[in-house]
Design a protein with these regions (language model features):
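Conserved ABC ATPase "signature" region
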Residues: 7-27
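Conserved ABC ATPase signature
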Residues: 31-35, 39
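Conserved catalytic motifs of ABC-family nucleotide-binding domains
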Residues: 52
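Catalytic Walker B motif of ABC-type/P-loop ATPase nucleotide-binding domains
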Residues: 56-60
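Helical segment within the ABC ATPase nucleotide-binding domain
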Residues: 71-83
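H-loop/switch region of ABC-family ATPase nucleotide-binding domains
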Residues: 92-93
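ABC ATPase nucleotide-binding domains
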Residues: 130-155
Length: 155
């Protein structure tokens, strides 16, 4: 069944709004093959948001983004969670940008895991147990630094 013109208009508006949210308006007519990794990542985030999901699954949403755009995307995902009551699940190795916005953390290491609040999970005792190694966790200016037996693992 073909889309009616008002359906097309609504979809175009949703896509335009989503691109604006990720500072990607100029990317609307750019071929994906010529975009940088960060530009492509922002377009993918816009694509996910334009469909107005009730559940947003984000696999490495900050990958290839510079710090300013990583913060923009993290804030955008958080705003979506709050304003649209969207359930958000984020898989990431870049946790410091995401941690201020999460309710719960699932930290997974070689099949072992811990679920809890940021404070319950991001600490020396918990990470030492998960990694089965002497791990030190320090919080510096609202960011976590994890140092293991073989050196640092900045998160």
């Amino acid at each position: 069944m073909p889309l009616r013109s008002d359906d097309r208009r609504r979809r175009r508006e949703a896509v335009q709004h989503a691109l604006e949210q990720v500072n990607g308006e100029r990317l609307a007519d750019v071929r994906a093959g010529v975009m940088s990794g960060g530009e492509l990542q922002r377009v993918r985030i816009a694509q996910a948001l334009a469909s107005d999901p009730m559940l947003l699954l984000c696999d490495e949403p900050l990958l290839a983004l510079d710090p300013a755009n990583a913060k923009l995307v993290a804030e955008l995902i958080n705003r979506r969670r709050r304003e649209a009551n969207t359930t958000v699940i984020v898989v990431t190795h870049e946790i410091n940008t995401i941690l201020p916005y999460v309710d719960r953390v699932l930290y997974l290491v070689d099949g072992r895991f811990r679920i809890g609040t940021v404070e319950q999970v991001m600490n020396t005792e918990t990470l030492s147990m998960l990694y089965r190694a002497d791990i030190q966790v320090a919080k510096v200016k609202d960011r976590y630094v994890v140092v293991g037996e073989d050196g640092g693992y900045p998160l």
